[in-house]
């Protein structure tokens, strides 16, 4: 049992191989988008697809090629916009068209390149700006008295 368990959660070489395999799969999907006539007029498509692939791999926590509810929750918290369980379910439903409980890479790229207004798309676009504009305070919090509390 401990041998099975250690193989499932092993890092190092096995994790590197897993990530390399995932990257090849996503690169193959990117090639499909590059060959698709529907996206031929998209500006800077190769650069965008590369950026989308990196973000997707960062938030695909279980390395199964899908962003599930917990991965989305972590992504939103990391971006500084935590959402409720219900809001995240609605986001996933909007991105997948209500077909799935997880966001596949194809759904993710379609959402990012599509004309639909998705909350997730806006968050991903402005991720860098939001993090730069609100630096986290350092040191202990300032002292407050009871009169200053709401």
UniProtKB/Swiss-Prot annotation:
Q: Which Pfam families match?
A: AIF-1 (PF21008)
Q: Does the keyword Zinc-finger apply?
A: no
Where is the secretion signal located? none
Q: Name one GO biological process term.
A: actin filament bundle assembly
Q: Where is this region: Disordered?
A: 129-150
Q: Write down the InterPro entries for this protein, in alphabetical order.
A: AIF-1_EF_pair (IPR049025), AIF1/AIF1L (IPR042433), EF-hand-dom_pair (IPR011992), EF_hand_dom (IPR002048)
Give every EF-hand domain span. Answer: 47-82, 83-117
Q: What is the membrane topology listed in the Swiss-Prot or TrEMBL record?
A: Peripheral membrane protein
Q: Which Gene3D superfamilies match?
A: EF-hand
Spell out where the chain crosses the membrane.
none
Q: Name one GO molecular function term.
A: calcium ion binding
Kindly list the positions at which N-acetylserine occurs in this protein.
2
Sites binding Ca(2+) sit at 60, 62, 64, 66
Q: List the disulfide bonds.
A: none
**In which compartments does the protein localize?**
Cytoplasm, Cytoskeleton; Cell projection, Ruffle membrane
Modified residues annotated as Phosphoserine in this record: 2, 134
User: What domain of life?
Assistant: Eukaryota
Q: Which UniProt keywords apply?
A: Acetylation, Actin-binding, Calcium, Cell membrane, Cell projection, Cytoplasm, Cytoskeleton, Membrane, Metal-binding, Phosphoprotein, Repeat
The record's Gene Ontology cellular component field reads: actin cytoskeleton; cytoplasm; extracellular exosome; focal adhesion; ruffle membrane
Q: How does it assemble?
A: Homodimer (Potential). Monomer.
Q: What does this protein do?
A: Actin-binding protein that promotes actin bundling. May neither bind calcium nor depend on calcium for function.
Q: What is this protein called?
A: Allograft inflammatory factor 1-like
Question: Which species is this record about?
Answer: Homo sapiens (Human)
């Amino acid at each position: 049992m401990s041998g099975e368990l250690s193989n499932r959660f092993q890092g190092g070489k096995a994790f590197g191989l897993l990530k390399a395999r995932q990257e090849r799969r996503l690169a193959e999907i990117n090639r499909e988008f590059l060959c698709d006539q529907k996206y031929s007029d998209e500006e800077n498509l190769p650069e965008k697809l590369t950026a989308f692939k990196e973000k997707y791999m960062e938030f695909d926590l279980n390395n199964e090629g899908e962003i599930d509810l917990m991965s989305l929750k972590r992504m939103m918290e990391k971006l500084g916009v935590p959402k409720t369980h219900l809001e995240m379910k609605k986001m996933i439903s909007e991105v997948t068209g209500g077909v799935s409980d997880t966001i596949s890479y194809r759904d993710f790229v379609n959402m990012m390149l599509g004309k639909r207004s998705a909350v997730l798309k806006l968050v991903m676009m402005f991720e860098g700006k939001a993090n730069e504009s609100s630096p986290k305070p350092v040191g202990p919090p300032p002292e407050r008295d009871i009169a200053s509390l709401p």
